[in-house]
Amino acid sequence: MEKFLDEWSLRILRELYKNSKISYKKLSKKVGISVTSCYYKVRDLEKQGIIKAYTIEIDAKKLGFPVKTLIEVKTRTGVSTEVVKVLGKYPNIFKIYGITGDKDVVIEAYFRNIEELDLFLKRIREICLDIKDTETHIVLNEHRNPKGWF
């Protein structure tokens, strides 16, 4: 049975989602509980595996990778570890998702330009014979719920 979180824990998660570097003192003020309670709630969230990591968000455009793509891949055998293994070798790929529907995999990847994207698509089709078809979407803009999805 799933354990539902109390309102304080949800508030903590929302604040950490906005800024994972926030101090316990500032976090406790924003959430409205003592620093000690805040510390223990965060520790409990970590122990439960709800908080898996504290990370950063990188601006790919400022790194010289302005072309963000979502590439749908249809394979001959469904989601195979071989396809994921081959695709995982490319540094342009940020995430690989196994999905339901007409396609088997969605790749989130970043490129310097359209030519680099085109070369990538040609290479993966040559190297990974299990890839039957791809459909590429270039992300024009991105919108995020500032409160988080939870």
What are these regions, as identified by a protein language model?
Residues 1-150:
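A compositional/biophysical signature of low hydrophobicity enriched in polar/charged and small residues
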